[in-house]
UniProtKB/Swiss-Prot annotation:
One Pfam family hit: THDPS_N_2
One of the GO BP terms on file: lysine biosynthetic process via diaminopimelate
Oligomer status and interactors: Homotrimer.
Protein name per Swiss-Prot or TrEMBL: 2,3,4,5-tetrahydropyridine-2,6-dicarboxylate N-succinyltransferase
Annotated residues for binding of substrate: R104, D141
Keywords for this protein: Acyltransferase, Amino-acid biosynthesis, Cytoplasm, Diaminopimelate biosynthesis, Lysine biosynthesis, Repeat, Transferase
Organism: Psychrobacter cryohalolentis (strain ATCC BAA-1226 / DSM 17306 / VKM B-2378 / K5)
Pathway in which the depicted protein is active: Amino-acid biosynthesis; L-lysine biosynthesis via DAP pathway; LL-2,6-diaminopimelate from (S)-tetrahydrodipicolinate (succinylase route): step 1/3
Main location: cytoplasm
Catalytic activity, reaction form: (S)-2,3,4,5-tetrahydrodipicolinate + succinyl-CoA + H2O = (S)-2-succinylamino-6-oxoheptanedioate + CoA
A GO cellular component annotation in the UniProt record: cytoplasm
Enzyme class: transferase
Length: 273
């Protein structure tokens, strides 16, 4: 039976499993998937022929992993302890391992085992959950959170306090995806499997879930679940049909190409909106 088949079958029987009753072959399969997610050789979602494909079986392995262990005390220095069932990624790393990985981890940043942090990525005091993928050159700024199985592209900047939603709680079908070269402004939230396409700029305080209307003021189009590539997005509202009230919406105020994006600072793009 293949690794995928073992996980798929185990997921169907997941309610029968606990740390005490987990079969050894299932335990080994889950740990193998977690190790592959941790070193980046497996991803919960990947782009193939221009479309994002979700490896649902890998996500199922992440969900099953919470049945592997009971909570246990995890020491983090002389005065700090955690009590959880998932180990942290860097708990036993040596200086040589950090240098080889090429990542910078600023205290008290935490990444869970089973997340991948690519070379050149920087974790300011932040949190990266299990199954997440943080690609090369990404900056996860102070108090930003990268949810379980979320996919963060190359050179993405997640500003202070940004929340990128996960798949575990509440259970989601697909991970949230931030493609390459995107900027997510401070305190913004992107959740529920929304895809922010390449080069988009999200202003401070923008909240986008699957039901959020994303209004393009140049074309009048309304998008849901997807921010088109190169969009510059700010918070706003749209009026009701009867004109009695307005409801929150994300507003695409302009589109920029890669050349413009390279020559123009994020602040300038937003000021000129």
């Amino acid at each position: 039976m293949s690794l995928q088949q073992t996980i798929e079958q185990a997921f169907e029987n997941r309610n029968e499993y606990s740390p005490a009753t987990m079969p050894q072959d299932v335990r080994d399969a889950i740990n193998q998937v977690l190790e592959q997610l941790d070193n980046g050789t497996l991803r919960v979602a990947e782009k193939k022929d221009g479309e994002w494909v979700v490896n649902q079986w890998a996500k199922k392995a992440v969900l099953l992993s919470f049945r592997l262990n009971d909570n246990y005390v995890q020491a983090a220095g002389e005065h700090v302890q955690f009590y959880d069932k998932v180990p942290t990624k860097f708990a036993n790393w040596t200086e040589a391992q950090f240098k080889e990985a090429g990542v910078r981890v600023v205290p008290p940043a935490v990444a869970r085992k089973g997340s991948y942090i690519a070379p050149g990525a920087v974790l300011m005091p932040s949190y990266v959950n299990i199954g997440a993928y943080v690609d090369q050159g990404a900056m996860v700024d102070t108090w930003a959170t990268v949810g379980s199985c979320a996919q963060i592209g190359k050179n993405v900047h997640l500003s202070g306090g940004v929340g990128i939603g996960g798949v575990l709680e509440p259970l989601q079908a697909n991970p949230t995806i931030i493609e390459d070269n995107c900027f997510i402004g401070a305190r913004s939230e992107i959740v529920e499997g929304v895809i922010v396409e390449e080069g988009a700029v999200i202003s401070m305080g923008v909240y986008i879930g699957q039901s959020t209307r994303i209004y393009d003021r140049e074309t009048g189009e309304i998008h849901r679940g997807r921010v088109p590539a190169g969009s510059v997005v700010v918070p706003g509202s749209l009026p009701s049909e009867d004109g009695t009230h307005s409801l929150y919406a994300a507003i695409i105020v302009k589109k920029v190409d890669a050349q413009t994006r390279a020559k123009t600072s994020v602040n300038e793009l937003l000021r000129l909106a």
